[in-house]
Amino acid sequence: MANKKKVALACSECGSRNYTITENPNRTERLEVQKFCKYCGKHTLHRETK
C-alpha cells in the first residue's frame, strides 16, 4: 500500500490551516473548496498547502 501524504487546507483570508486531507497522486492542480473558518466565523475559500 502506498503512503499518502497529508496536506493542509488553509483559509485564504486569515491563513489559518483548519483542515487536513490525504493527497490524491492523480490530481495535479491544487484543491480549492469553500469551508467554514472558525477563526473568521464565516465560509471562506480554503486552498491546499504543502
Swiss-Prot record:
What family does the database annotate? Belongs to the bacterial ribosomal protein bL33 family.
Query: Know the name of this protein?
Result: Large ribosomal subunit protein bL33B
Example GO biological process term?
Answer: translation
Q: Name one GO cellular component term.
A: ribonucleoprotein complex
List keywords of the entry alphabetically: Ribonucleoprotein, Ribosomal protein
Keyword Ribonucleoprotein, does the record have it? yes
Q: Name one GO molecular function term.
A: structural constituent of ribosome
User: Out of the domains of life, which is the source?
Assistant: Bacteria
Q: Which InterPro entries match?
A: Ribosomal_bL33, Ribosomal_bL33_sf, Ribosomal_zn-bd
